[in-house]
Every structure is written in structure tokens, then in C-alpha cells.
Amino acid sequence: YDNIVFTRFINFEDSIFVKKLNWSGCLQEEDRKIVIDTKNNPIFDKSIYSSVNKELIDYIEKNKITEIYLCGIDTECCVLKTAFDLFELGYNVYVLKDYCACTHGVERHNNALDILRRNIGKEYIV
């Protein structure tokens, strides 16, 4: 791949995730650590499900990227929402199913992949 980027979820004490879901993950720096070597590739921070924000879109446009290969955790929320957002912006987004996972099990992962097949096209789930 010519361009590789990472995203990192950062939660806050007053976030919607804490307030409405009582989810306190990723509040601490240790919980937000990227555990593989990023090899100095860009890291974009986010505090919502989607990785799509102005900073990422600016990077995509600056580098003239038209095809995006997406992987990550959790398939049924962050990956799904990011794939939908990129699809709606007109990008060819391929979800690398074997490089995605769900912390709530394989069944939810597979359900998310089925939803993605239906909504962005089965040929984009690889």
C-alpha cells in the first residue's frame, strides 16, 4: 500500500460514550496505545465511531487517494461507520474482513460484514 494511516480512539469523561453507554474504555493513555509499529505513518485521533474527519479527508485529497482499504476494531461500529462515511463520499472503500474484528465475538463481526455487503457492495468486502 502506498499510503498507510492509523486512527486512535480517544474517550473523554464527558463523552456521549461515558454519559449514555457508561463505557469508559480509552480514557487512559495506556488504553489508547497502538501496539504495532506505525513506522512513522500518520496517526489521526478521533472521538467518534467514524474515522472520517476533516484531517483525514484533507490527507486523502492531498495524496489523491481514490481507493481505501479499511481494517480495524470493532467491525460492527467503527469499521462499519467509517466504511459507510467513505462510501457516501464517493470513495471505493474495501473492507479487509480478515483484518477486522469485534470485541463482542465472531457473530457480531460476521453480522457487520453482511450489513456492509448489502450497503456498500459485496465486491468491496475482501
Placement of each model-derived feature along the sequence:
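Von Willebrand factor
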Residues: 1-14
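Active-site-adjacent betaalpha module
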Residues: 3, 17, 21-126
